[in-house]
Amino acid sequence: MPFADRVKVNFDHPDSMDTPLLAENVRQLRAGQAIERPTYDYANFQRLKGTVRIEPRAAIIVEGILIFESKALRELLDIKIFVDTDPDLRFIRRLVRDIRDRGRTTQMVVDQYIKTVRPMHLEFVEPSKRYADVIIPEGGHNDVGIDLVIQKIKSLVPRPTDS
């Protein structure tokens, strides 16, 4: 797809994600199989040809703002955590990241935020909080919440045995 067309895609809508592939990758990792994770060029809005090999581990962390939108994916997750961040802080982080890392202008970021980011957040991301087992407020700066999550993960991950 030409760059001019890729720029027009709403990447904040769940349909823009390859959720079936992500779900299959999670299934494979849970089954003890390595996967080849696609790589993306966010500055140019495209999936690259190369992949990154991911080996299975005792704990698998899947992150993304739209992961709770898919029931099939939710069913593969043992713990679902939603990190709730103030909207102003989310916008500032996006503005800084997109200018610094993706070559965007301030106006481009503002336009995208108004046109797609905020509406999609309100339609898909915010309502998906209801599927979370844990909601951590303060954008991850909540030490008590984070400590509780760490303890829960440790309780689920088998301890290595001494040989």
Located regions from the model:
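Conserved nucleotide-sensing/catalytic segment adjacent to the nucleotide-binding pocket
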Residues: 1-44, 59
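Short, charged, surface-exposed secondary-structure boundary motifs
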Residues: 22, 90-93, 147
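Short, basic, glycine/proline-bearing loop/turn elements
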Residues: 28, 34-35, 56, 106-112
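Conserved Switch II/interswitch segment of TRAFAC-class P-loop GTPases
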Residues: 32-37, 85-90, 107, 141
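Short gly/ser/thr-rich secondary-structure transition/capping motifs
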Residues: 39-48, 60-65, 115-119
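ATP-dependent NMP and nucleoside kinases share a basic, alpha-helical "lid"
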Residues: 48-102, 157
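NTP-dependent small-molecule kinase module
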Residues: 55-56, 96-99, 118-163
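Anionic, Ser/Thr-rich low-complexity intrinsically disordered regions
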Residues: 72, 82-83, 88, 104-114, ...
